[in-house]
């Protein structure tokens, strides 16, 4: 069976994860556009998948492609401001308010992540849908070759977009 998965579902979750890592490291991890192949595998494994019809690219722009130019001008300084803050504000349950605010930005520019959805007459969560496809992220590996690492050996790819420090 052929599927058309939503890239934006992975993008939404990756931006939130990257922001959390940036805040946790006091800005030592770059919060910017870009990512690695592992971000996709991690996203599928931890968050699941949704069909493109549930969160299509460009849905907020009336286009078939997403435009991140304004999004980046809004989101990047927001995360930088959180990093520079002296004390993070929390709600009554101790949850950081900035995550809710960032989710609002992501929802405004990318679209809202579905908690549940119906696909071909059956109700799914993103995780149950991913499981139903039979796609196993553990069946895939990153391949790279750099002359300063031994060939045919795993290593952490030292590039800015590999902020998860995956091999």
Give the ranges of each region predicted by the language model:
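Catalytic-core signature of thiol
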Residues: 1-167
